[in-house]
C-alpha cells in the first residue's frame, strides 16, 4: 500500500513497464492579445521573454480546474482564463540541447503573473516550488519534459533528470474525493491515476 493508501494494483514504479520507465532575450514590443510578455527579474537579470502564447495546464481528474500560482505555491483552482495567475509560458529555449533519457525535449513553465518558474520538489510527495526565472541561465532544476500520450492526449509531466517523478494533483484521484480548489501539485511516482495525466493547452 502506498502513501495514498492505494494497493499494489496501481503499479508502483512499473506503470509503464520496466523500472518505472514511461511506457507508458532583449527588448520585445508590446505583446498582442492572447500573447504574453513577461518581465523576468529573477537573479537581477531583468530580461524579457519574447511574446509568446500562454498555456493552460490541467489534469484529467478534473479539466475544469487549472494550475495556478497562489501564495508562492502551485495549486489547482477553478479554471478562469481571465486570471493571469493561471497563464503559463512554456519556454522551450533549451529544448534542442537538453532532453530527458527518452529523448523528449526540455521546457520551463513560467507563470505570466509572477515571472516565476516551477522548480523540482525536494522529492516524492513534496510540492513543486516557484522560483525566480532567469532565461539566460540554464537551470536544470526548472526543466521538465512531457511523456508519450498516456490516454486521450494527456501526458505525464516529469523532471528532465528523473522521469520517474511526475506532476501529481495530490489526493486529486477519485479515491480521495477528487480535485478541489487549492489541491497541491506534488511529485510522485507513476501510479496510473488521472491526477497524474496532464495537458498543456494554448489559450486561444
Curated annotation (Swiss-Prot):
Highest taxon of the lineage: Eukaryota
Key words of the record: Lectin
Keyword DNA-binding attributed: no
Induction pattern: Induced by abscisic acid (ABA) and salt stress in shoots.
CDD domains with a match to the protein in the record: beta-trefoil_Ricin_AtEULS3-like
Transcription regulation among keywords: no
InterPro entries tied to this protein: Ricin_B-like_lectin_EULS3-like, Ricin_B-like_lectins
Tissue: Expressed in shoots and lamina.
GO molecular function, one term: carbohydrate binding
Domain Ricin B-type lectin, first and last residues per copy: 54-200
Domain comment in the entry: The ricin B-type lectin domain binds glycan structures.
Cited function: Lectin which binds carbohydrates in vitro. Interacts through its lectin domain with glycan structures containing specific motifs.
Annotated protein name in UniProt: Ricin B-like lectin R40G3
Amino acid at each position: 500500500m502506498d502513501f495514498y493508501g492505494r494497493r499494489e494494483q496501481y503499479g508502483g514504479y512499473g506503470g509503464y513497464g520496466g523500472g518505472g520507465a514511461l511506457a507508458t532575450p532583449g527588448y520585445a514590443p508590446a505583446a498582442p492579445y492572447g500573447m504574453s510578455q513577461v518581465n523576468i527579474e529573477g537573479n537581477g537579470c531583468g530580461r524579457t521573454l519574447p511574446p509568446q502564447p500562454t498555456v493552460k495546464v490541467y489534469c484529467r481528474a478534473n479539466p475544469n480546474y487549472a494550475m495556478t500560482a497562489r501564495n508562492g505555491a502551485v495549486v489547482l483552482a477553478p479554471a478562469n482564463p481571465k486570471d493571469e495567475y493561471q497563464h503559463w509560458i512554456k519556454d522551450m529555449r533549451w529544448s534542442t540541447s537538453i532532453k530527458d533519457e527518452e529523448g523528449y525535449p526540455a521546457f520551463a513553465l513560467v507563470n505570466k503573473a509572477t515571472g516565476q518558474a516551477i522548480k523540482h520538489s525536494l522529492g516524492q510527495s513534496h510540492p513543486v516550488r516557484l522560483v525566480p526565472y532567469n532565461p539566460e541561465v540554464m537551470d536544470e532544476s526548472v526543466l521538465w519534459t512531457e511523456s508519450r500520450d498516456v490516454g486521450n492526449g494527456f501526458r505525464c509531466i516529469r523532471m528532465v533528470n528523473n522521469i520517474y517523478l511526475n506532476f501529481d494533483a495530490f489526493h486529486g484521484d477519485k479515491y480521495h474525493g477528487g480535485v478541489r480548489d487549492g489541491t497541491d501539485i506534488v511529485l510522485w511516482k507513476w501510479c496510473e491515476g488521472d491526477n497524474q495525466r496532464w495537458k498543456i493547452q494554448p489559450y486561444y
